[in-house]
């Protein structure tokens, strides 16, 4: 309904991210299908960022939107699930009619990926590599299962349990009051000063209902996350 209401004369499509950064939440399959049907009815394009798709922890999610039809544009990367951050290597799946157009754009932006990056990417699909990535995904889930409840207990409330990626999107309203500040920007600065814990304030993620939210990353080790909670507890408990 929101997509339908927002569609205007100049609208050409919808850009989605699932799982998303900063919330780590995914679009439910039924909701994604409904969105795509609205876009299709208007003759538009559904473009979806699936870069964190491999780091899904709920069986209800973790399935590519490409299953909805051949008119989906999917963007993905080797950076997250395949742990090749910094190699700047990814892929895009587009409808057949768009291939030649995308090729012209691509060859004027980056020509092609480096040889060493392509060989490294091929190694990602070896059984030994996949086993390592799946073990790593389980570790991310364990960190989430520890970190999110601990934040909630300290008054850094998580509105929706993340089902993917490695982030915690927390409302710092109550915690900021305990530190004598207001808003997420002042809160993260005070948090850094008191605990040496770095979090990302709302302003990096747009302006829609974000003013009292901050993002933590759970990409650190379990030991580091436990230490972070211990430091937060000393200030907020």
Name every feature range the model reports, one short phrase each:
Residues 1-237:
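PLP-dependent class I/II
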């Amino acid at each position: 309904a929101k997509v339908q209401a927002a569609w205007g004369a100049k609208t050409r499509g919808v850009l989605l991210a699932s799982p998303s950064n900063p919330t780590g939440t995914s679009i439910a399959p039924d909701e994604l299908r409904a969105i795509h049907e609205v876009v299709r009815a208007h003759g538009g394009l559904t473009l979806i960022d699936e870069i964190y798709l491999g780091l899904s922890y709920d069986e209800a999610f973790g399935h590519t939107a490409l299953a909805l039809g051949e008119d989906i544009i999917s963007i993905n990367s080797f950076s997250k699930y395949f742990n090749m951050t910094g190699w700047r290597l990814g892929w895009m799946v587009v409808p057949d009619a768009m291939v030649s157009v995308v090729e012209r754009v691509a060859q004027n932006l980056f020509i092609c990926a480096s040889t060493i990056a392509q060989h490294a990417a091929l190694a990602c699909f070896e059984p030994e590599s996949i086993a390592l990535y799946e073990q790593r995904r389980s570790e991310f889930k364990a960190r989430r299962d520890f970190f999110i409840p601990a934040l909630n207990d300290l008054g850094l409330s998580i509105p929706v349990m993340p089902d993917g990626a490695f982030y915690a999107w927390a409302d710092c309203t109550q915690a900021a009051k305990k530190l004598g500040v207001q808003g997420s920007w002042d809160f993260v600065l005070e948090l850094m000063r008191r605990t040496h814990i770095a979090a990302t304030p709302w302003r990096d993620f747009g302006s829609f209902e974000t003013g009292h939210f901050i993002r933590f990353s759970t990409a650190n080790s379990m030991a580091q996350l436990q230490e972070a909670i211990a430091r937060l507890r000393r200030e907020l408990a």
